[in-house]
Amino acid sequence: MQLTKVPFGQLNGEQVDLFTLSNDNNVTIKITNYGAIITSIETPDKKGVCENIVCGFNKFEDYISNQYLGSYPYFGSIIGRFGNRIAKGKFTLEGKEYTLAVNNGANALHGGLVGFDKKLWNAEEIKADDKIGIKLSYTSPDMEEGYPGTLNVSCTYTLNNQNELVIDYEATTDQTTILNLTNHTYFNLTAGKGNIMNHELELTAEALTEAEDMIPTGKIISVEGTAFDFRTKKKLGRDIAGLEYGYDNNYVLGNNEGRLVYAGTLSEATTGRSVEVYTTQPGMQLYTGYWNPELTIDGEKKFGSYSGVALETQHYPDSVNHSNFPSPILKPGEKYQEKTIYKF
């Protein structure tokens, strides 16, 4: 196994680095400390051909270009402080109301205007006999983006020879706050040769959070007999025609005790590639990327609608405003700990 670091660019006068993790099975993962972004995951297909199976860029400049930020899909980034939506950008903690920037219609999305996805994280390399990785750390000051408490947060990416990318999140706070971290990687197992409609997905989830205008109503509803039922493996495109904007739904994993559970598998028959998902999180957002922009990169048009599918393990959207949902509240003296594994 091998771990390397090279300069990737400059942000406000500070160097941005790119780390490459390679195992002994030709799985290679590239991560930058800007936004803790996974820029590339190369895996072999059934013929042994290694290609990048996620949406991302080879150059740092493309991550900060006006073209990309103008229709921003959060490729590969860590989302925080609060992944997904908070209704009207408002929540109450210990009797005090907090107001966040509204950046998605009438709601707050993915941590605000400058979330963790746009921060420069500190990086520490990890080299062990059975894994390699990087630990990325960031201190979010009190009231950054409207969230209370100074938050010390870390995201550790490790790769092993079982072809597992393990993401470990940890955080502590000095005031009661809310936290919901996720990774926003989009997978395309054809390496971008086609869209994701013929990818097959199996999910264990028996229910999802009902939503109106992307905000949970508070009800948990069964997937039985609906287009949202993936308990038996099926193609993403099979039932998508009846969904105006494709899939963008929070699945209930029935995992409120923080155990590591199997959530599902994404696979693609022509390449033989697959991604298994395991997590301690109670939910997972399935997002098929309807709003992904078509971008011109090095003179070539890339991405666009349905160019990748995100499997975002998370706490439920707007969970701070629903007492019947698993709580995203973190108090002083407590440690936030979550784990997600993508196995290739």
Model-assigned labels for residue ranges:
Residues M1-F344:
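An exposed, glycine/acidic-rich loop-and-rim segment of catalytic or binding clefts
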